[in-house]
């Protein structure tokens, strides 16, 4: 064999063994073979996909694309995607070695996605679910403003429709190119989950895959009612080398693995990929009859300043509302009036007497359907509200409460 032939064979072998990740949009020139990251065995990509990207030699779970994950979990022809065309922008005009816009364009062309998550609804063994799947191939699955917005919208939709939420996490953390806008998504998603879990009493299952790190781990990834993980998944916040350099200590070999977290009580279950759909199906079947499950209601609060039309509607509502459906916001009004009664007692002593009587008559609300009308038209109460916070603030507060409970005044 000549030297040129040997070099050519080595080049072809290197091309075949290169670890490529095929998406449906990928070009065939990316290769037909890949190598296991754990044992190094060469794997035929077509057969690897059929085995859900689990190594035939050692059982190691290689990374899956979000599309492959959805196909493995959702029943055929039931997937309905949300917000497919929502695309990130570059608010900070960030640039390191390459402009952020160029990185986004490259990732979108390579993966066929607009950002690092796919969200939507579908059926899992006939059970309706709201599903979000992160894709590590898109800029390391980093969480930017679009990822946070899509996940938040998914959770809010699930809350309104009474659906369980399943999020499959695979991320390197918050996206540094978007700065504080990416960090804000941690709080936004967590707030939506609080309403979904604690107010609507609906189920949220978090599936942790390798890797799940950074701001995703510090927020919604670890907030699930149930935490599932794949075997040997890398799960943590800071990197291993960063921790070792900070502590000046050698960490255990299995540190930040799914097995390590399960041993220390931070996970509920480690599920092999081939059994994940079955485990989720059995869990959802058990939860389906839960007595506390209910369709949710999301309190949005006031959105922007009052318009002149809305302000006039609220003024009329203060004078003429007689409908019992508004009575459920009286408790909040009583709390506000109680606070005013404690802070302004020296100027209007008669107001304090009225408010104290109001606090001691809890059953009054049930007996009198016109309580809300009398409360708002009371001269003493009007004086208290106007004195403490002014008419405009009172209208803003009322607008907030009506919007929170999705009430539209009838005029």
Swiss-Prot record:
Family: Belongs to the AccD/PCCB family.
Record-level GO cellular component terms: acetyl-CoA carboxylase complex; chloroplast stroma
One Gene Ontology term of the molecular function aspect: ATP binding
GO biological process: fatty acid biosynthetic process; malonyl-CoA biosynthetic process
Chain residues that bind Zn(2+): 36, 39, 55, 58
NCBIfam families to which the protein is assigned, alphabetical: accD
Textual note on the cofactor: Binds 1 zinc ion per subunit.
Main function: Component of the acetyl coenzyme A carboxylase (ACC) complex. Biotin carboxylase (BC) catalyzes the carboxylation of biotin on its carrier protein (BCCP) and then the CO(2) group is transferred by the transcarboxylase to acetyl-CoA to form malonyl-CoA.
Pfam families: Carboxyl_trans
Name under which the protein is recorded: Acetyl-coenzyme A carboxylase carboxyl transferase subunit beta, chloroplastic
Compartments, as annotated in UniProt: Plastid, Chloroplast stroma
Disulphides: none
PANTHER family for the chain: ACETYL-COENZYME A CARBOXYLASE CARBOXYL TRANSFERASE SUBUNIT BETA, CHLOROPLASTIC (PTHR42995:SF5)
UniProt pathway annotation: Lipid metabolism; malonyl-CoA biosynthesis; malonyl-CoA from acetyl-CoA: step 1/1
Residue spans, zinc finger C4-type: 36-58
Key words of the record: ATP-binding, Chloroplast, Fatty acid biosynthesis, Fatty acid metabolism, Lipid biosynthesis, Lipid metabolism, Metal-binding, Nucleotide-binding, Plastid, Transferase, Zinc, Zinc-finger
Tagged with keyword Manganese: no
Name of the top EC class for this enzyme: transferase
Domain of life: Eukaryota
Catalytic activity: N(6)-carboxybiotinyl-L-lysyl-[protein] + acetyl-CoA = N(6)-biotinyl-L-lysyl-[protein] + malonyl-CoA
Lineage: Eukaryota, Viridiplantae, Chlorophyta, core chlorophytes, Trebouxiophyceae
Keyword Disulfide bond: no
Quaternary context: Acetyl-CoA carboxylase is a heterohexamer composed of biotin carboxyl carrier protein, biotin carboxylase and 2 subunits each of ACCase subunit alpha and ACCase plastid-coded subunit beta (accD).
EC number per UniProt: 2.1.3.15
Gene3D superfamilies named among the record's database cross-references: 2-enoyl-CoA Hydratase, Chain A, domain 1
Gene: accD
Domain CoA carboxyltransferase N-terminal as annotated: residue spans: 32-302
